[in-house]
């Protein structure tokens, strides 16, 4: 079993403020036209989507819920949640990715509202307005991930859920997510990940506590290259997901 460290992030955000990296935006905007090609650089994301969707739905129950998907990219997770009956808004700061997301929504007939806005700006504008916030494969690509977590906590109503996923920071994660996925297996373009931006579970838990979020569940993810199937795991050494609930007032 190997880790799904080859998964491309949804988006890193657009350089409209201090919590964005222009290089990250340029890097992933260049891949925007490949979002919905299951055999492109985004194949791992397509393969992973059923697992993370089922995990999120199992905890939060998406049907009828108002959801914001931060760093939605081309809308793979956003559309999947909408298909389960959620009222989804996908936000991103990559103009190209959002154009792809809008077009695919029209083609598929799955209604998703997309908006080009920073998480912090939306949180300031609409605090406590949604039931669920997702921020998947994105936090390791911004300068200040704690600011994004705080925005997630501000956006969600008391008692609502916040879901995040990212990559742990240790030798195993470096070998698998950077050396293995980018240089040996060449599953991702070189330079996709910056090891220094990886986030340990303890750091993520601290961000959440500071934002008034309680941990509900943490799970790792593993990948079987033969079956091309992702599975939940207790191993959080590389890729992991965390579910939080905003403390009720």
UniProtKB/Swiss-Prot annotation:
Positions contributing to S-adenosyl-L-methionine binding: 52, 71, 92, 136
Class of this enzyme: transferase
Pathway membership: Cofactor biosynthesis; ubiquinone biosynthesis
Disulfide-bonded cysteines: none
Reactions that this protein is recorded to catalyse: a 3-demethylubiquinol + S-adenosyl-L-methionine = a ubiquinol + S-adenosyl-L-homocysteine + H(+); a 3-(all-trans-polyprenyl)benzene-1,2-diol + S-adenosyl-L-methionine = a 2-methoxy-6-(all-trans-polyprenyl)phenol + S-adenosyl-L-homocysteine + H(+)
Highest taxon listed in the record's lineage: Bacteria
Residue ranges of the TM segments: none
Keywords: Methyltransferase, S-adenosyl-L-methionine, Transferase, Ubiquinone biosynthesis
InterPro entries on file: SAM-dependent_MTases_sf, UbiG_MeTrfase
Gene Ontology molecular function: 2-polyprenyl-6-hydroxyphenol methylase activity; 3-demethylubiquinol 3-O-methyltransferase activity; polyprenyldihydroxybenzoate methyltransferase activity
Entry's EC annotation: 2.1.1.222, 2.1.1.64
The keyword Cell wall biogenesis/degradation appears for this protein: no
Gene3D superfamilies associated with the record: Vaccinia Virus protein VP39 (3.40.50.150)
An example Gene Ontology biological process: methylation
Stretches for region Disordered: 1-23
Pfam family, one: Methyltransf_23
Family: Belongs to the methyltransferase superfamily. UbiG/COQ3 family.
Function: O-methyltransferase that catalyzes the 2 O-methylation steps in the ubiquinone biosynthetic pathway.
Name this polypeptide is given: Ubiquinone biosynthesis O-methyltransferase
Naturally occurring in which organism (per UniProt): Cupriavidus pinatubonensis (strain JMP 134 / LMG 1197) (Cupriavidus necator (strain JMP 134))
Name of the gene: ubiG
């Amino acid at each position: 079993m190997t880790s799904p460290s080859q998964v491309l992030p949804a988006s890193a955000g657009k350089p409209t403020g201090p919590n964005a990296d222009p290089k990250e935006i340029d890097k992933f905007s260049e891949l925007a036209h490949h979002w919905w090609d299951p055999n492109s650089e985004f194949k791992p994301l397509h393969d992973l989507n059923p697992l993370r969707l089922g995990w999120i739905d199992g905890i939060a129950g998406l049907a009828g819920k108002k959801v914001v998907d931060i760093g939605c990219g081309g809308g793979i997770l956003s559309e999947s949640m909408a298909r389960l009956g959620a009222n989804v808004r996908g936000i991103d700061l990559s103009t190209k990715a959002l154009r792809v997301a809008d077009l695919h929504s029209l083609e598929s007939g799955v209604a998703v509202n997309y908006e080009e806005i920073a998480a912090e700006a939306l949180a300031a504008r609409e605090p406590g307005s949604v039931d669920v916030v997702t921020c998947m494969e994105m936090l390791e690509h911004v300068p200040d991930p704690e600011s994004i977590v705080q925005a997630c906590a501000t956006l969600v109503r008391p008692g609502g859920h916040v879901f995040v996923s990212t990559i742990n920071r240790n030798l195993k994660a470096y070998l698998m997510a950077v050396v293995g996925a980018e240089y040996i297996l060449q599953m991702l373009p070189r330079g996709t990940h910056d090891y220094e931006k990886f986030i340990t579970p303890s750091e993520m838990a601290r961000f959440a506590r500071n934002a008034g979020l309680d941990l509900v569940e943490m799970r790792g993810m593993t990948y079987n290259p033969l079956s091309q199937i992702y599975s939940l795991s207790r191993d959080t050494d590389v890729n992991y997901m965390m579910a939080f609930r905003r403390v009720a007032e």
